Amino acid sequence: MQRIMLRAKLHRVTVTQADLNYEGSCGIDQDLLDAADMKEFEKIELYNVNNGERFSTYIIKGERGSGEISLNGAAARRAHLGDQLIICTYAPMSDEEIAAYKPKVILVNEKNGIKEIKKF
């Protein structure tokens, strides 16, 4: 049996840009992507801490070191500049894989810089 498990989480990142007229997606600083082992075009689930909205989209690479968290297209309607988001990826895993796996959680500072990397 496969279970859908948390793979990685960017915890309480701050929205820095929203562009309703862009094609879609979420731009994420390359440093955050590397730390969380998230890949461009990977599906993500986003949870808005400020208003409770929950939605999904896909990743595009943001400029390294920029602190960018940009919501594009329809996703731009789900959050405002300055809102805090939790961004997660999930993966199907067998019970054997789960026994040895630990998800990554990236904690950030007020500028979306990496503050701490946790493995649970």
Swiss-Prot record:
Belongs to the PanD family. Its main location: cytoplasm. Catalyzes the pyruvoyl-dependent decarboxylation of aspartate to produce beta-alanine. Pathway: Cofactor biosynthesis; (R)-pantothenate biosynthesis; beta-alanine from L-aspartate: step 1/1. GO terms for biological process: alanine biosynthetic process; pantothenate biosynthetic process. It catalyses: L-aspartate + H(+) = beta-alanine + CO2. Substrate binds at residues 57, 73-75. Binds 1 pyruvoyl group covalently per subunit. The keyword Lyase applies. SUPFAM superfamilies: ADC-like. It holds the Pfam family Asp_decarbox. The gene is panD. Its cofactor is pyruvate. GO terms for cellular component: cytosol. HAMAP family: PanD (MF_00446). Keywords: Autocatalytic cleavage, Cytoplasm, Decarboxylase, Lyase, Pantothenate biosynthesis, Pyruvate, Schiff base, Zymogen. It is an enzyme of class 4 (lyase). The active site is at residues 25, 58. It comes from Cupriavidus necator (strain ATCC 17699 / DSM 428 / KCTC 22496 / NCIMB 10442 / H16 / Stanier 337) (Ralstonia eutropha). Heterooctamer of four alpha and four beta subunits. The modification Pyruvic acid (Ser) is found at residue 25. Is synthesized initially as an inactive proenzyme, which is activated by self-cleavage at a specific serine bond to produce a beta-subunit with a hydroxyl group at its C-terminus and an alpha-subunit with a pyruvoyl group at its N-terminus. It is found in: Cytoplasm. One of its GO terms (molecular function) is aspartate 1-decarboxylase activity. This is Aspartate 1-decarboxylase. Its EC number is 4.1.1.11.
